[in-house]
Amino acid sequence: MLAAYLAERLSARLFVPLALALALAASAGDVSLGVLAVDAGFALMLLAQFRSWDDLADRGRDAVSHPDRVIVQAASVAPIVGFSGALAILNICVAIERDGSGIAVSVLTMLIFTLGTWYALRAGRTAAGDHLLLSKYPAIVVVIAGERVLSAPVFILGSALALYFAVFAYEVWHDPASPLSIGGHR
């Protein structure tokens, strides 16, 4: 079930370019292949964690709008819960190991707490809620960058902001159910 879920919801066609964009935004201009590959790998792990959280939180709504999804049809979501929990722990460990400044782990734990609280408390989709969910992408840039944000704040934070606007535009364009969408529900 987990393999089918990952194949369905973590399409390499979408997530590899997104991971590369996140890694480039966090690069501080160092686009050496080794750094880019490690950063993109970390980005993929973070994206998988937060995609699975999004899908777990949306399972009830997806039962109506996307009844064919693996997570909706599954008798138990325990494998996905275990996977996302293990990824959260692994990502925290990677953030600690990669960044001695504490920036990465601080931003990551704040993101985990904020989104976890939002998922637990939200009653439905709102424009503010969708903006909050999209803010995970610039936060992920800072998590990947870690202490590099201290030496190149304009590059990294500017890139993170540009990435936010790109994912916002994508959300407006591709998800007619989003309160942010042109023509979507309000």
Put a short name on every predicted segment.
Residues 1-186:
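Multi-pass alpha-helical membrane architecture of UbiA-family
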